[in-house]
């Protein structure tokens, strides 16, 4: 595996090149399709930059909520979320469960940071934190 450039640097460089060098010359529907492609590259860049850390903190919060901290559990993040959903469906967990509401809120904010960082409501919430 090569150290430089990183996948994040590569996707950002391609997006910047398309945005700054190619977009001005493209018109009509192709300009729209190009903007969609650039947005997808920006999304991948954010995923590469932010997702690992947010997944790790989400898994830690889920482990605590599910009473698994300190245990040797090898479940994936999807497994932990499935266990959370099952706990909610079974009535074992609800919004009165300490930490659940904060976990759901933080998970939503972390996902918006990757998927929709320019979403007006997300930006407003960041200003209030």
Segments the model singles out, each with a brief description of its role:
Residues 8-16, 30, 59-129:
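C-terminal amphipathic alpha-helical interaction region
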Residues 15-48:
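N-terminal interaction modules that seed assembly of large macromolecular complexes
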Residues 47-63:
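Short, charged early-sequence alpha-helical segments and their helix-coil boundaries
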């Amino acid at each position: 595996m090569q150290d430089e450039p990183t996948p994040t640097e590569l996707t950002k460089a391609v997006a910047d090149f398309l945005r700054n060098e190619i977009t001005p010359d493209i018109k009509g529907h192709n300009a729209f399709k190009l903007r969609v492609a650039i947005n997808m590259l920006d999304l991948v860049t954010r995923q590469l930059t932010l997702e690992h850390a947010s997944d790790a903190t989400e898994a830690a919060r889920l482990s605590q909520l599910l009473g698994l901290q300190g245990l040797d559990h090898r479940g994936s993040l999807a497994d932990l979320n499935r266990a959370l959903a099952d706990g909610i469906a079974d009535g074992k967990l609800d919004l009165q469960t300490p930490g659940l509401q904060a976990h759901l809120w933080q998970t939503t904010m972390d996902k918006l940071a990757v998927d929709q960082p320019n979403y007006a409501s997300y930006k407003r919430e960041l200003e209030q934190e």
